[in-house]
Curated annotation (Swiss-Prot):
The lineage of its organism: Bacteria, Bacillati, Actinomycetota, Actinomycetes, Mycobacteriales. S-adenosyl-L-methionine binds at residues 70, 88, 108-109, 125. This is Demethylmenaquinone methyltransferase. It catalyses: a 2-demethylmenaquinol + S-adenosyl-L-methionine = a menaquinol + S-adenosyl-L-homocysteine + H(+). Pathway: Quinol/quinone metabolism; menaquinone biosynthesis; menaquinol from 1,4-dihydroxy-2-naphthoate: step 2/2. SUPFAM superfamilies: S-adenosyl-L-methionine-dependent methyltransferases (SSF53335). InterPro entries: SAM-dependent_MTases_sf (IPR029063), UbiE/COQ5_MeTrFase (IPR004033), UbiE/COQ5_MeTrFase_CS (IPR023576). Pfam families: Ubie_methyltran (PF01209). It comes from Nocardia farcinica (strain IFM 10152). PROSITE patterns: SAM_MT_UBIE, UBIE_1, UBIE_2.
């Protein structure tokens, strides 16, 4: 595969056409994990650990890690002893993570290639925001989850302290694209990141949409002052 530095810089639009989003992630795949660590100032490792804890996985459980990218989160979840499969609609991302010893499947969150009630738990980290129809995706996640199973969504959200929120938005819209230019193979993708985070629902709004999609007992926990929120819900029996 050609090195991604040779790709034309490209970003998806906020209508999130699947082919555009997949192509954009194909273009950042080679340096994706490094770029995430840099732009999050190392917080990405803590966020993955916190997501695994929120999943409360047990050995032998079956877990779907959706929008898994290169599988770095899947490896984190597998530390629990659960059987974890990574799924993503960017074949470039899956190829970049092919060295990781976890099963990987190409799949669209809006039409998951799995049977009903296949998984004890589903996680999606920083991916629901990139789906054209997040509500349909959450219903698909419900379909493939066993009764009593759970969904954890890790996603960029709304900082809870107003002053910090202002500073964060300044970083997101102005500084982050400049940082991305130094490390990413497709810095324009991080302009899309900033714009999509700004347009994303806040914590309460996302919880309401989870409930409307059929998830029960929905709660959330803020990480890093609300830069990221973990939402968890359950499928009733």
């Amino acid at each position: 595969m050609a090195r991604t530095e040779q790709r034309e810089s490209f970003r998806a639009s906020l209508d999130k056409q699947p082919h555009e989003v997949a192509s954009m992630f194909d273009g950042v795949a080679e340096r994706y994990d490094l770029t995430n660590t840099v732009i999050s100032m190392g917080q990405d490792r803590y966020w993955r650990w916190a997501t695994r804890k929120a999943l409360a996985l047990r050995p032998g459980e079956r877990v779907l890690d959706l929008a898994a990218g290169t599988g770095v989160s899947t490896v984190e979840f597998a530390k629990s002893g659960a059987w974890c499969v990574a799924a993503d609609f960017s074949k470039g991302m899956l190829a970049a993570g092919s060295f990781r010893e976890v099963p990987m499947v190409a799949g669209d969150a809006m039409a998951l290639p799995f049977a009903d009630e296949s998984f004890d738990a589903v996680a999606i980290s920083y991916g629901l925001r990139n789906v054209a129809d997040p509500d349909l995706a959450m219903r698909e996640m419900l379909r493939v989850t066993k009764p009593g199973g759970r969904l954890v969504i890790a996603e960029f959200s709304t900082p809870v302290i107003p002053v910090f929120r202002t500073v964060y938005m300044e970083y997101l819209m102005k500084a982050l694209p400049r940082v991305a230019r130094a490390v990413s193979s497709n810095p324009d993708a991080y302009v899309y990141l900033a714009e999509s985070v700004r347009a994303w629902p806040n914590q309460r709004q996302l919880a309401m949409r989870m409930a409307a999609a059929g998830w029960s007992s929905v709660q959330w926990r803020n990480l890093s002052g609300g830069v990221v929120a973990l939402h968890r819900g359950y499928r009733l029996g």
